[in-house]
C-alpha cells in the first residue's frame, strides 16, 4: 500500500472502484468531527451526479438533508463521529491533522464492502509524508484503537470532493451527521449553537459559558481552537 499524489491525466477514476473519505467539523468550534467513507457502485455514479451530488460546502443544509437518504440507498457507506469530549481527550496527544486521519480510519473500518477496491481517495490535507506518518501512527499494532488497514493504494487529491463522486458523497453524509449532532446538542441544552469559528461565535461562547454554568466547554466545543474566551 502506498500514498500517491493524484494526477487526473495519469489515473482515470471514473471506471474504478473507489472508496472516498471526507470529514466535516474541522472549522467549527462547536460540535463534533465527523468522517464518512463511501463506495459507489460503478452503475450508480451517473445517477448520483444527475441528482446534483457535489462538495457539501457548495450546497445548502436543506439540500444535504434531501440528498443524504438517496446517497445511502445507492452506496455502501459508514460514518464515524468524534464527539467534542472524545475529540478533546484525543487532542491532548494528537494534532488536528492527526485527528482527521483518526476519523477517516474510524469510518473506513466500519465500512462493509463486497467488491474489490482499486483505490481509497482522500483530500490532500497535508504533505504526503505527513499523511503517511499519521496513518502509521494509528495503525500501529500497539495503538488502542484497532483500525482496519488500507489494503489499497491511497490517492491524495487537492479538492478531492470536486474530483470524486465518492468523496462528494462522503462530504454530504458527514455533513448530514454533523447537522444531526448539532441539533441534538441544541435540544439537550435549549440553545442554538452557531457554526464556524468567527468573532460572533466567540462572543456567543463567551456569553454562554458565563451564563450557563451547567454546560461544560469540553462537552460542546473543540478546545483546540484558540478562542481566548473569558469565563
Each model region followed by its residue ranges:
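Acidic (Asp/Glu) carboxylate-rich active-site/surface patches
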Residues: 1-19, 23-34, 38-231
Amino acid at each position: 500500500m502506498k500514498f500517491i499524489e493524484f494526477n487526473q491525466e495519469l489515473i482515470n477514476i471514473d471506471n474504478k472502484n473507489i472508496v472516498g473519505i471526507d470529514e466535516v467539523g474541522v472549522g467549527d468550534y462547536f460540535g463534533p468531527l465527523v468522517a464518512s467513507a463511501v463506495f459507489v457502485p460503478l452503475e450508480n455514479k451517473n445517477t448520483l451526479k444527475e441528482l446534483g451530488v457535489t462538495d457539501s460546502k457548495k450546497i445548502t443544509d436543506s439540500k444535504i438533508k434531501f440528498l443524504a437518504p438517496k446517497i445511502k440507498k445507492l452506496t455502501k457507506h459508514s460514518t464515524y463521529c468524534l464527539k467534542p469530549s472524545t475529540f478533546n481527550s484525543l487532542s491532548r496527544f494528537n494534532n488536528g491533522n492527526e485527528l482527521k486521519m483518526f476519523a477517516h480510519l474510524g469510518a473506513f473500518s466500519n465500512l462493509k464492502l463486497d467488491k474489490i477496491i482499486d483505490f481509497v481517495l482522500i483530500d490532500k490535507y497535508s504533505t504526503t509524508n505527513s499523511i503517511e506518518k499519521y496513518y502509521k501512527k494509528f495503525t500501529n499494532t500497539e495503538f488502542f484503537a484497532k483500525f482496519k488497514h488500507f489494503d489499497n493504494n491511497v490517492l491524495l487529491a487537492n479538492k478531492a470532493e470536486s474530483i470524486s463522486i465518492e468523496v462528494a458523497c462522503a462530504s454530504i453524509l458527514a455533513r448530514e451527521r454533523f447537522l444531526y449532532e448539532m441539533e441534538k446538542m441544541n435540544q439537550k441544552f435549549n440553545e442554538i449553537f452557531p457554526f464556524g469559528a468567527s468573532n460572533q461565535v466567540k462572543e456567543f461562547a463567551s456569553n454562554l459559558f458565563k451564563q450557563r454554568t451547567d454546560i461544560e466547554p469540553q462537552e460542546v466545543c473543540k478546545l483546540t481552537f484558540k478562542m481566548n474566551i473569558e469565563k
